[in-house]
Amino acid sequence: MPFAFATAADQADQALAGLDMGHDHARLVVLARAGRSWRLEQCHEWPLEPGWLQGGRIGDFLPLADTLQQSLADTGVSRLAMALPAEACASAVLEQPGGWSRLRRRAWLQRQAAALLQRPLSDLTWSAHALPGRPRRWRVLCASLDVVQDWMGLAEAAGCDLIGLDEVHQASWQA
């Protein structure tokens, strides 16, 4: 999901909320502009009810959306960036065969992402990041579009402006 997070976050001086949910808790941080950087204003953490999240997917949508909406209302922030739960993402570190053009490498990376989730490329979002060193290695990260759409719907139901949905942050921890 190609969100230009840095650009979206930098375009306004409004406060920004960041949400990270695990299988049993949620953490919401509020950042405010401090010149050219961001300053931590608030940090809230609360437990999630059993069944609200199941394997990175939203299991009980309405109570989770209501809780998120109330938490955001308490902060007064409407702009939100979220990290997908680690269980919602797949990742792998792959060694690239040598001598390939950019187009051939891109097609290979796409096939690898589709193989990770065992789904057609049209059913997922993916990204690849070159790792330093030789031989050339890539970290491929992906999530299914239906999971991404669930999380985008959660932000919409909570009444916030989603400026970033990050699978890279979570999936990179699995690699």
Where are the regions that the model predicts?
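Gly/Thr-rich phosphate-binding beta-strand-loop-beta motif of the actin/hexokinase/Hsp70
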Residues: 2-47, 80-85, 175
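Short glycine-rich phosphate-binding loop at a beta-alpha junction
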Residues: 16, 68-70, 75-87, 155, ...
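Gly/Ser/Thr-rich loops at beta-strand to alpha-helix junctions
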Residues: 25, 86-89, 145-146
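A short alpha->loop->secondary-structure connector
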Residues: 35-40, 97-109, 156-162
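Internal amphipathic helical hairpin motif
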Residues: 61, 84-141
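Short, surface-exposed recognition loops or helix-turn segments adjacent to catalytic cores
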Residues: 123-131, 160-175
